[in-house]
């Protein structure tokens, strides 16, 4: 997971929703499908084949990729299971677990008349956004990201 995986918090803004949607997200990718086969067996989800079209500087085609996305219902269990083995993404996993715990503790009712959920409170939006930004900083790549990550 440290090299080929993703642990993050996604945000989606829809025009017809009164507040943004946040969700915990975990997954893994590899050029070998066999490496990923254990994940759907224990956590659900599917492995997707990505036909790679890019080439390197010598004109060689990049290897095709396989991606597995952890279902929302299994993300907490998955992160708890892999946490002892993580080296580089420990802080991200802990922040996402905190996000899941807070999200599950937040009592959210139904919207009247239009269906869907009631809007998030400003305090809840700020809490979720704070965690999302912390995870994004830790996941940043490049020379400016070193201060925010573990490795």
Task: Cite the ranges covered by each PLM segment.
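Internal intein/HINT superfamily modules and their associated LAGLIDADG
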Residues: 1-151
């Amino acid at each position: 997971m440290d090299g080929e995986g993703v642990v993050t918090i996604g945000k989606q803004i829809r025009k017809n929703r009164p507040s943004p949607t946040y969700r915990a997200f975990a997954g893994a990718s590899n050029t070998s499908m066999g490496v990923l086969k254990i994940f759907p067996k224990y956590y659900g989800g599917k492995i997707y084949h990505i036909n790679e079209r890019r080439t390197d500087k010598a004109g060689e085609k990049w290897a095709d990729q396989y991606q597995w996305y952890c279902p929302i219902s299994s993300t907490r269990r998955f992160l708890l299971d892999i946490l002892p083995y993580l080296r580089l993404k420990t802080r991200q996993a802990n922040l996402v677990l905190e996000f899941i715990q807070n999200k599950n503790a937040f009592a959210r009712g139904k919207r009247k008349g239009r269906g869907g959920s009631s809007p998030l409170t400003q305090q809840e939006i700020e809490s979720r956004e704070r965690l999302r930004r912390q995870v994004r900083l830790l996941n940043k790549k490049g020379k400016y990201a070193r201060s925010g990550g573990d490795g």
